[in-house]
Amino acid sequence: MKFNGKLQLHTFLRIAICLLVGICIGDATADAVPVALWRWLFVGLLSLLVLLHLSKRLEMMQTLLIFCVVMAGGAWRITSYENSLRCAFTGEEEVYEAVVVSQPIKKRRSMKCELAVVSGRLAGHRLNAYFQNPNSLNRIVVGDGIKAQSVFSGFDDTYAQRGGFDWRRQRMVRGIVARTFVASDKWKRAEVSLEAMPRIDRLALSLQSLRYDLLSRLQGSALSEDSYATIAAMTLGDKTGVSAELRDTYSKAGVSHVLALSGLHLGIIYAMIALLLGRRRNTMGGLLVTLLLVWTFALMVGMSPGIVRSAAMFSVYASMTFLQRDYLTANSLALAASVMLLASPAMLWDVGFQMSFLAVMGIVICHVLLRNNRFYVRYAHRRFVGKLVSLVCISLAAQLFVLPLVMYYFGNVPFYFLLANIVAVPLTTFIIYAAMLLFVLSPLCRFAAWMTVVWQWLASGVGWVVAQMNTLLKVIASLPGASAEGVYISALQLSLMYVLIVALVGVWRYGQQMYDSMHGKFKSEDDLKKLRIKSKRVKE
């Protein structure tokens, strides 16, 4: 079975596009086309593909069939997933056992948390639970089992929603099928069996309990509320303590990604792992340790789409480095997307998934164009200026591809994002390294009193840095014209903006190639290296 032309260079990219199209078709026809039809279509097309491959004929037809098989498989996966979430509600109280899988959030009159039902009619599903009398729930933490009796109901999505944000889609991504209000006398803590939960979910639950312990130790230090909330969000993905004011500050400054675990945070942790392993990172043992630590961290912080994408990308990168093969960024990104969508096709509509992949795609496409010019190469070898120029290029590339989505979902356009990123990214790197050191030293405080003093001193220092960063971001967010709010766009405008971006990037790339051919500019990485060496010699 052969791929022809440029298909060999971007195999997974084309497959990912076909999978995405298939998922969209399956979702649009979910009510009209049964799951069985998509299943049999997938089996039939796959059988035909195998027959053509064995006969070694019609290679172009084989390529076309591969794409059709992928599309049919995507439609099959999404329709099966959506059917599994459909539940009927009786309107009567039901007895069930469940386990707490998200950090409880205190509301005005209740406490909200996410439950995974392990026994009862909705066993295997998740639901949003609202507990009466929140003051009595201080002891409820992630991993606790409960036995309750309440009425399950659907969600009311008739209220107006600004922008393109769809709460129904977001619940579908998380597998939440119902909501329930639990009276104070209708539940109790209980030892529940987790056999109904998949093994990966049980492992994630155990690691999230460890995450809660780390958060408790951090909360016990003398940190301000905003400092604690910022560190918890940056390191362990817990945003429950982030106030509306702090969230608004980061949004207006254009650095909301700092509070959401993504490639930036996992990249810092990956660099830390590589530094600790040293030369052994390129061995089989080093590769296994790296993959184990990366995915353990991803499970511990909740497996959000952004962190899963980052973990998959760094896994591919580590594997390619070990095999000493070229690291094809576009193919690796497409491979990560395909694996994630096959595992959970509804993730396609997750806002974090979309923004994460588009940001990386922007970096993949535009950062290469930005760095392939003499200005970048002239300063790339300089330690401080080179890193600053690289940071600006990455921020511009990511913002270009993410901005239309931000306008579509949130109606916010930050104008000082470059300045904010120059401030936030280096400080975030320091904060994550220091926070990880805090987590490692925390257990040692039980054995030596002087270690407690050192730990508190270090925590105070980290808290001071976080406070200064938050202050600087507040100043940036308060500058005149820092952001434009209420700039919502429609789905059609969103599509047209991305068409325009792709067209501009194409023209930019074509113009750069024409300029290179006319002026004899460098075209290869070897030429870039020669120019860097020449720049160093001239400077010396």
What are these regions (language model features)?
Residues 2-5, 58, 62-257, 485-486:
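Membrane-interface helix/helix-cap signal primarily in integral membrane proteins
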Residues 361-481:
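Alpha-helical transmembrane segments of multi-pass integral membrane proteins
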Residues 10-16, 202-204, 208, 235-240, ...:
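Hydrophobic alpha-helical transmembrane segments
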